[in-house]
From Swiss-Prot:
SMART domains, sorted: C2, PLDc
Protein name listed in UniProt: Phospholipase D alpha 1
Family: Belongs to the phospholipase D family. C2-PLD subfamily.
GO molecular function: calcium ion binding; phospholipase D activity
Spans traversing the lipid bilayer: none
Keyword list, A-Z: Calcium, Hydrolase, Lipid degradation, Lipid metabolism, Metal-binding, Repeat
Length: 808
């Protein structure tokens, strides 16, 4: 049967199964009987029955487990499912859980064509075995479904229509009006980075300085400082710009936190416990997060530092549990403090939060100039970070790895949502309940309240999103009704939050003209490819976001309208570029790009349009190249000859690592957070993540282009990457703009990859070194099989030993 594209939203309710025989009842198929020569028996013990929802082989939902109801399990669970899948059937799979995995009971198939009219379908569907024969007793599952095609979404392709836009539906945290946001590009912006970017109302964009603001927030806190991080390092300074000194600015972060705790401020830290940081491997762990060092530094001090494992969904099998707690992480990066009121003279305090991609650790301090060699005797002499070369060290010289990242400061009601996230996590994994009781300080710390008036041109509406589950946080709704309303989904026993992926999908479906996406890992798990490799069902989350992007472009091509997506990636994922893991990720990345380009080229051909697909979807990376200057730092040693390290040092070039996780839509809506576009970040039961989505209600792209802070931030980023400002860049959806950016990036790549360079690279934005064939296949850019100075293939290579769970 031919597949039908379901692109929209699917509402599903799973009620119950009737006449089910479980426990010790034999459930088997003829094919399995022939293979195993004995019947397959459900696990003995307490039956734990659950059901999952698949669109063909893509897993899109799962119920909680029902215990001690082996004959008539009742879930009454509802699901709000974003879909963009070619499918034949909606499949309901019923299983009995056991410690190793789960035992299949049967599957029920509902043909997709029954849903296409958009009418509600409420029926009992027969459960079949693997040979498509009815299981014993003729068991059926009661389900209700209704499909809403994307064209029925009132926000589809219209952007944010008005200031009354309610935010992303079915989420744990509602959208909060009356907020204020500071947007940060990189950890620091020096005074000589001064692009003149006009905004509406005769204003000009003014950049903010992340680590200066974090330093001030910690220094001025009087009651509490709460921090979570993938890594938190104690031996580095937040303030390093000698032209912008601060009193006490040379203090190390660890010393500053101890000082505040000794003053009576409640300092609590949740730091990911890297299980590889043990003596059998190496003390700082495979990821070099310094978690053990940080814990030891604060031991017996007034700072409460807790190392917390990423515990798995409790319903997982034993093997899955060991896997998740070892390879998945706590990836949220937040700081929450009490702060002074914005108006002087008040003794009251308020809550201020920081959310984004920058950890408080070594290797993160950088500026928009991203120097490779010229800061090695100043800002980066004691903070030399270069994990892409074996044996790299400051004593051997550069290039260091520059770090491009994005962060935000949140004020107003949304700051309290970040605080509540920390409190949920602390109560689950923090040990002693030593959270500050803010009710006892209600005369001092004001409750959640707007910090701007509705008619203030600079007011923001902000919403907080997460990937997390009950293994990492307390206080989620427990009833199916409450969970569905909050957009929560079930693990086998845990409630899971996946609102970050919902936010991205919701944002992708709305815009009219353009996307700018920065992400450190961008993967579409290529469902068919995984099926061939693993012969198994797989989750849909990592597939859907890139597919939504390509479907969006296709819809615009079919409507005869302009639309452009700009994606900025790291040249390769951080690590040794020839390694199996990096090459496997690059292979998945190539497949993702290829899937998207095939969709676009097919649409162009179907509509008789002869145009470069890079006018609609274009990929970039960042890099720098510097000529040597007199007075530069001279290392006392040299890298080993004929290595990536020595070649990069000789050619004076290296990638700028893109760690940012950000999307800008139509210059009116922005998402900033910690999550990558991959399975582990979007799943909810793997890496824990946090993000915010925001817009300014007085700066929307309704009748004319938006010219608020988001536009200014986007133009400032482009100035950082391109080294120029141009009127063409103000309209990113236009053919003139995308061709200008592509032309400049092509030129910069040629300069970056050339044998010699007489001057500094004039900008950092490089064409991602791939070519697109006539049918959409992603191929090598001529002469670029390997990344410069390496023997690492640009297109990557499929790993024969690393499972996709590690590389997607």
């Amino acid at each position: 049967m031919a597949k039908t594209l379901l692109h929209g939203t699917l509402h599903v309710t799973i009620f119950e199964v009737d006449h089910l025989k479980a426990g010790s009842v034999v459930v088997f198929s003829e094919s399995l009987r022939r293979t195993l020569r004995k019947p397959l028996v459900l696990a003995k013990g307490t039956p734990k029955i659950y059901a999952s929802i698949d669109l063909d082989k893509a897993r899109v939902g799962r119920t909680r487990m029902i215990e001690n109801e082996p004959n008539n399990p009742k879930w009454n669970e509802s699901f709000h499912i974003y879909c963009g899948h070619p499918s034949t059937n909606v499949i309901f799979t019923v299983k009995d859980d056991n410690p190793i995995g789960a035992t299949l009971i049967g599957r029920a198939y509902l043909p997709v064509h029954e849903l296409l009219e958009g009418e509600e379908v409420d029926k009992w569907v027969e459960i079949l075995d693997e040979d498509k024969n009815p299981i014993s007793e003729g068991s059926k599952i009661h389900v209700k479904l209704q499909y809403f095609d994307i064209t029925q979404d009132r926000n589809w392709a219209h952007g944010i229509r008005s200031s009354k836009f309610p935010g992303v539906p079915y989420t744990f945290f509602s959208q909060r009006p009356g907020c204020r946001i500071s947007l940060y590009q990189d950890a620091h912006v020096p005074d000589n980075f001064v692009p003149k970017i006009p905004l509406s109302g005769g204003k000009f964009y003014e950049p903010h300085r992340c680590w200066e603001d974090v330093f001030d927030a910690i220094t001025n806190a009087k009651h509490f400082i709460y921090i979570t991080g993938w890594s938190v390092y104690t031996e580095f300074a937040l303030i390093r710009d000698t032209r912008r000194p601060k009193p006490g600015g040379d203090i190390m972060l660890g010393e500053l936190l101890k000082k505040k705790a000794d003053e009576g401020v409640r300092v609590l830290m949740l730091v990911w416990d890297d299980r590889t940081s043990v003596g059998l491997l190496k003390k700082d762990g495979l990821m070099a997060t310094h978690d053990q060092e940080t814990e030891e530094y604060f031991r017996d001090s007034n700072v409460h530092c807790v190392l917390c494992l990423r515990n798995p969904d409790d319903g997982g099998g034993i093997i899955q549990g060991l896997t998740i707690s070892t390879i998945f992480t706590h990836h949220q990066k937040i700081v929450v403090v009490d702060s002074e009121m914005p108006t002087s003279g008040s003794e009251n305090r308020r809550v201020v939060s920081f959310v984004g991609g920058i950890d408080l650790c070594d290797g993160r301090y950088d500026t928009p100039f991203h120097s490779l060699f010229r800061t090695l005797d100043t800002a980066h002499h004691d903070d030399f970070h270069q994990p892409n070369f074996e044996g790299a060290a400051i004593t051997k010289g550069g290039p260091r790895e520059p770090w491009h990242d994005i962060h935000s400061r949140l004020e107003g009601p949304v700051a309290w949502d970040v605080l509540f996230n920390f409190e949920q996590r602390w109560r689950k994994q923090g040990g002693k309940d030593i959270l500050l009781n803010l009710r006892e300080l209600q005369d001092v710390i004001i409750p959640p309240s707007p910090v701007t008036f509705p008619d203030d041109d600079e007011t923001w509406n902000v919403q907080l999103f997460r990937s997390i589950d009950e293994g990492a946080a307390f206080f989620f709704p427990q009833t199916p009704e409450e969970a569905a309303k909050a957009g929560l989904v079930s693990g086998k026993e845990n409630i899971i939050v996946r609102s970050i992926q919902d936010a991205y999908i919701h944002a992708i479906r709305g815009p009219k003209i353009s996307f700018i996406l920065k992400i450190s890992i961008f993967l579409e798990a290529l469902l068919a490819g995984i099926q061939r490799i693993l012969k198994m069902r797989t989750s849909v989350l990592c597939i859907l976001i890139p597919k939504e992007l390509s479907l969006k472009i296709v819809s615009k091509i079919e409507a005869g309208k302009r639309f452009t997506v700009y994606v900025v990636l790291p040249m390769w994922p951080e690590g040794i570029p020839e390694s199996g893991s990096v090459q496997a990720i690059l292979d998945w990345q190539r497949r993702t790009m290829e899937m998207m380009y095939k969709d676009i080229i097919q649409a162009l051909q179907a509509n008789g349009i002869e145009e470069d697909p890079r006018n609609y979807l274009t990929f970039f990376c960042l890099g720098n190249r510097e000529v040597k200057r007199d007075g530069e730092y001279e290392p006392s040693e040299k890298p080993d000859p004929d290595t990536d390290y020595s070649r990069a040092q000789e050619s004076r070039r290296f990638m700028i690592y893109v760690h940012a996780k950000m999307m800008i839509v139509d210059d009116e809506y922005i998402i900033i957070g910690s999550a990558n576009i991959n399975q582990r970040s979007m799943d909810g039961a793997k890496d824990s993540e946090i993000a915010m989505g925001a817009y300014q209600p007085h700066h929307l792209a309704t009748r004319e282009p938006a010219r608020g802070q988001i536009h200014g931030f986007r133009m400032s980023l482009w100035y950082e990457h391109l080294g120029m400002l141009d009127d063409t860049l103000a309209l990113p959806e236009s053919v003139d703009c995308v061709q200008k950016v592509n032309t400049v990036a092509d030129k910069y790549w040629d300069l970056y990859s050339s044998e010699t360079l007489e001057n500094d690279l004039p900008g950092h934005l490089l064409r991602y070194p791939i070519a697109v064939a006539s049918e959409g296949n992603v191929t090598e850019l001529p002469g670029t099989e390997f990344f410069p100075d390496t023997k690492a293939r640009v297109l990557g290579a499929k790993s024969d030993f690393l499972p996709p769970i590690l590389t997607t």
